């Protein structure tokens, strides 16, 4: 296997290489027993969330960032997702877009309250369904840019859209990337 199930860490206040200790069951693995390929990450600074996974999964796991150990079950996504884009503030984490093997690129945005476990809820929709999209956020907005789709026809997007994380609703178009990319 060229991928493993391990959590790699490096203290954020120090320079150096990650500690590649063998903590079991993680997030970025593929291969015969892969669970997490293209997961989406969110954090409130204390808790880190991992959403989605290989072949369109509904995984929703978390870790406590300040300690080592295995991930724990947080809940489930509403739909199975691979290669979505993650945004968060100190309260909410959301995943937008993505795909699963049986459907075209998704426009769905799902969210959770980071401090409490539970299943994801519907936030709204992206302006364009796509996967492999970039995502950034601050304390008020979550933005998704670019991305691609494969079904029914392949495309690459230059769309940039955003949501206000404090309230639910559909994303708004806020411009375009200089070129379409994923």
Question: What is each PLM-predicted segment?
Answer:
Residues 1-182:
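Polar, enzyme-active/binding microenvironments
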């Amino acid at each position: 296997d060229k991928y493993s199930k391990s959590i790699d860490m490096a203290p954020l206040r120090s320079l150096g290489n990650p500690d590649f200790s063998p903590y079991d069951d993680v997030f970025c693995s593929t291969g015969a027993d892969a669970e997490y390929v293209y997961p989406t990450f969110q954090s409130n600074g204390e808790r880190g969330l991992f959403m989605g996974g290989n072949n369109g999964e509904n995984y929703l796991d978390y870790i406590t960032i300040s300690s080592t150990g295995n991930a724990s079950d947080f809940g489930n996504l509403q739909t199975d997702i691979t290669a979505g884009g993650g945004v968060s503030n100190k309260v909410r984490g959301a995943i937008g877009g993505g795909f699963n093997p049986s459907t075209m690129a998704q426009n769905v945005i799902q969210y959770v309250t980071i401090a409490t476990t539970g299943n994801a809820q519907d936030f709204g929709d992206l302006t364009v369904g796509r996967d492999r999209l970039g995502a950034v956020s601050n304390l008020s907005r979550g933005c998704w840019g670019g991305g691609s789709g494969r079904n029914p026809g392949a495309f690459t997007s230059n769309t940039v859209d955003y949501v206000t994380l404090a309230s639910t609703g559909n994303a708004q178009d806020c411009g375009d990337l200089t070129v379409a990319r994923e």
